[in-house]
């Protein structure tokens, strides 16, 4: 019992966490379709979860527009340094357009990313398909920062 209590903090300390930045393009196909660029920040607080915030600026119905989306995501293979990783998420989105009232939406996302366990590289792409006030499609690149112990594995 005493050994289990001593090992519990060590096991938790080795849990894979990460901080991520992303940049890409997004479009939402809806009655007033949106197209623009997006920047994202995400934190993986534990093994297979990620909390992601994306902010996009562009146009909708020929007017300046912005979108914000926050999702909690489940990563199927978060430590994979090769291949692709699948993830799914649920959250909320807000869309605003000049001279129009803003609107909030439920956000559902399904994504595919290259090597979710690799920190950096030109191959760290992602693509997403989801629903958030219309059909949302996004693609871009991610930079990741992992704990120092991860780079030595």
Locate the predicted segments by residue.
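Bacterial N-terminal signal peptides
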Residues: 1-8
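Outer-membrane beta-barrel "beta-signal"
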Residues: 68-70, 108-110, 134-153
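Gram-negative (and chloroplast) outer-membrane scaffold detector with strong preference
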Residues: 38-119
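Short glycine/proline- and aromatic-enriched beta-strand/turn motifs that initiate or cap beta-hairpins
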Residues: 12-63, 74, 144-153
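Short, surface-exposed connector motifs at secondary-structure boundaries
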Residues: 16, 117-125
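Solvent-exposed loop/turn segments connecting transmembrane beta-strands
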Residues: 24-36, 57-66, 96-104, 127-139
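Intrinsic low-complexity/disordered segments
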Residues: 9-12, 70
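Residue-level detector of the transmembrane beta-barrel scaffold of outer-membrane proteins
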Residues: 20-22, 50-54, 85-89, 124-128, ...
